[in-house]
């Protein structure tokens, strides 16, 4: 049969409450005190109830929580007590122990002293209202056996006070059994959660929450202690996880910088290994027909898409010569004819076929004197070059001459003659055929830094193109300045150039003599000045309509050593037949003759005296006038420029752009200046 249950319910409502004290000692202890104008109590026991009104009074609530707020349990254990006074007397005294939850507006505690008793106490303070609710369930015989309510105050509150005292005494009497049951449940939950966390996250999972409320102070304390000792707060464990380093760096034990260095050294070892070749060596080896093990010399891949590819430190000619030492010559010869390598000077490639060069040591022609002389050897002393490959041969000769003059002039003279097959087995590097270098057939030489062979080759090709093609179309030898000879051609010659060319043709075995290529100048030389010298003449046809020269940006640089040497040779050659100054052409006056530097169309002799008189008479010596004077002095000292000025002074434009770094020059003067500079470079 079911035992009768008693249910006590109390509802307090306060009018015009005002909080006068709120003291929060820490997160687990809070005290609040209110004053009110009047209060109303609704007291119900089972099916009976009554209402009680109180006047002014105050209410004090104390909330205590055991353990830390972050212990991990769903509800913290603690207690809450509420004392109410009215009309100067104590009207109510409520106390409940159990699981507690509180915040700024709501405070509630639920307690259970055993299987036959439970209680709830809640206080709500929100929007100017204050309410207190108290509910308790217990057995009738349980309450009657614990004693009457004689010690209580008023009759209306006797049952509540007795119930509260009975709840406390019952909790102390029946506490051990309930605490043991709750402790076992919590231990089982902790065991299960510990197994789950260790299996899923390796002992780093989130801590579980110990649920369930228990009566008695010792039970609540034990649950909080076990939660703190066995399982930590999940937020703290996650924070420790974030501070750990990533597993990759933790396993390797090396920082990212050390790993990057390790990758770099590994790549270097693979590139210089005995059996492997990197990508650049494979590309250069495929172009030269080579193979085999990896070489120590690194050659950059040639790329024609780059306009400044000739500035690379390595040229494919060295890679070709080194690969030819390790292989048979006939195999390399086949690859050299069929493959066309990229030009290192950025120029497009022209395939070179066999039979273009015919060897004839005894024959020499004026067309061979138009290019720079090749290195003197038994096989290549003189070669007849077709007109289509004149520029390519001149560029190749300049390249080889530069290498011989720099490295070993003595060894170049004593080099043994090479076979025809080895001479022809060269890979076209640019638009020219490069003869084999005997110096690289020996032990591999250390890399030279940097090489300017490709730059010299490009400059030589530019000079040859300007000399062979462009000057033939320019109206520099027009009938406006020079009288035509029979047949409409003009004989243009220079005595010093002819002497140098004759000396080159008669040179023996030894260091190659370097000579400036014969220049097509604009001066008129009488036929008597070249008596006893092999004639080196060029028949130039003059077009009908003379166009104006092209404006080009060019630095004005003349080597004084070349100027003095050329001036000495010019003075010795012109002693027999001096050059008569031509009459000034009509309309040849300069447009801007500021300091009377070149008044009228005067020649180079009277310009210096007029400049000195103008410089002494002028009061202001500005920087512009000094620059112009220096320029004219350099022109007077240079025989090539003086010769061109004698014949072409009238073709000069009036404005001088030397202050701005610009100057309008004729292509013939440009070729003369560049040739003089290159000749001085070879002489040094």
UniProtKB/Swiss-Prot annotation:
InterPro entries: U79_P34 (IPR004138)
Protein name from the UniProt record: Early phosphoprotein p84
Biased composition (Basic residues): 326-335
Compositional bias ranges of the Polar residues kind: 425-442
Localisation per UniProt entry: Host nucleus; Virion
Organism in which the protein naturally occurs: Human cytomegalovirus (strain Merlin)
Low complexity composition-biased segments: 359-377, 612-622
Family under the similarity heading: Belongs to the herpesviridae U79/UL112 family.
Major location category of this protein: host cell
């Amino acid at each position: 049969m079911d035992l009768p249950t008693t249910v006590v319910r109390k509802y307090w409502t306060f009018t015009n409450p005002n909080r006068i004290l709120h003291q929060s000692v820490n997160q687990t202890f809070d005290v609040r005190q209110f004053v009110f104008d009047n209060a109303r109590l609704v007291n119900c026991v089972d099916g009976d109830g009554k209402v009680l009104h109180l006047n002014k009074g105050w209410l004090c609530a104390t909330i205590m929580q055991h353990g830390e707020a972050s212990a991990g349990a769903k509800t913290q254990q603690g207690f809450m007590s509420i004392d109410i006074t009215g009309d100067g007397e104590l009207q109510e005294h409520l106390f409940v122990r159990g699981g507690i939850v509180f915040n700024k507006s709501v405070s509630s505690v639920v307690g259970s002293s055993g299987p036959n008793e439970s209680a709830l106490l809640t206080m709500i303070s929100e929007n100017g209202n204050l309410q207190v609710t108290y509910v308790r369930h217990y057995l009738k015989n349980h309450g009657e056996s614990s004693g009457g309510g004689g010690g209580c105050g008023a009759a209306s509150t006797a049952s509540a006070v007795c119930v509260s005292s009975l709840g406390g005494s019952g909790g102390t009497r029946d506490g051990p059994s309930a605490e043991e049951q709750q402790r076992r449940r919590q231990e089982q939950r902790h065991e299960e959660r510990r197994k789950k966390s260790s299996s899923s996250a390796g002992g780093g999972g989130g801590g579980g929450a110990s649920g369930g409320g228990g009566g008695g102070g010792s039970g609540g304390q034990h649950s909080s202690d076990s939660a703190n000792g066995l399982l930590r707060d999940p937020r703290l464990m996650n924070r420790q996880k974030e501070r750990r380093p990533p597993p990759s760096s933790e396993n390797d034990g090396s920082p990212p910088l050390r790993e990057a260095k390790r990758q770099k050294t590994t790549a270097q070892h693979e590139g210089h290994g005995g059996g492997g070749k990197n990508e650049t060596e494979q590309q250069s080896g495929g172009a030269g027909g080579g193979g085999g093990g990896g070489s120590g010399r690194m050659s950059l891949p040639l790329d024609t898409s780059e306009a400044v590819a000739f500035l690379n430190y390595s040229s494919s000619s060295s890679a070709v010569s080194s690969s030819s030492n390790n292989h048979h010559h006939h195999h390399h010869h086949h690859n050299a004819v069929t493959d066309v390598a990229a030009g290192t000077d950025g120029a497009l490639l022209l395939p070179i076929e066999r039979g273009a060069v015919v060897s004839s040591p005894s024959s020499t022609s004026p067309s061979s004197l138009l290019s720079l002389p090749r290195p003197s050897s038994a096989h290549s002393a003189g070669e007849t070059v077709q007109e289509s490959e004149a520029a390519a041969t001149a560029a190749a000769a300049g390249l080889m001459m530069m290498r011989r003059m720099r490295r070993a002039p003595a060894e170049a003279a004593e080099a043994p003659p090479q076979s025809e097959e080895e001479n022809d087995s060269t890979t076209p590097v640019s638009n020219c055929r490069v003869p084999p270098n005997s110096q690289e057939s020996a032990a591999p030489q250390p890399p030279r830094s940097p090489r300017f062979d490709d730059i010299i080759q490009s400059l030589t090709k530019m000079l040859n193109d300007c000399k062979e093609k462009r000057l033939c179309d320019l109206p520099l030898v027009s009938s406006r300045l020079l009288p035509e000879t029979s047949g409409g051609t003009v004989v243009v010659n220079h005595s010093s150039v002819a002497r140098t060319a004759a000396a080159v043709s008669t040179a023996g075995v030894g260091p190659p003599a370097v000579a400036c290529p014969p220049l097509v100048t604009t001066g008129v030389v009488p036929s008597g000045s070249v008596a006893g010298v092999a004639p080196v003449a060029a028949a130039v046809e003059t077009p009908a309509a003379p166009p104006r020269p092209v404006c080009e940006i060019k630095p004005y640089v003349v080597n004084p050593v070349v100027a003095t040497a050329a001036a000495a040779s010019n003075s010795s050659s012109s002693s027999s037949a001096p050059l008569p100054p031509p009459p000034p052409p009509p309309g040849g006056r300069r447009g801007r003759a500021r300091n009377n530097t070149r008044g009228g169309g005067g020649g180079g002799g009277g310009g210096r005296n007029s400049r000195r008189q103008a410089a002494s008479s002028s009061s202001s010596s500005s920087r512009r006038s000094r620059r112009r004077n220096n320029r004219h002095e350099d022109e007077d000292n240079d025989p090539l420029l003086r010769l061109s000025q004698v014949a072409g002074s009238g073709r000069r434009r009036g404005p001088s752009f030397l202050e701005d770094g610009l100057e309008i020059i004729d292509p013939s003067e440009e070729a003369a200046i560049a040739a003089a500079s290159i000749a001085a470079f070879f002489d040094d």
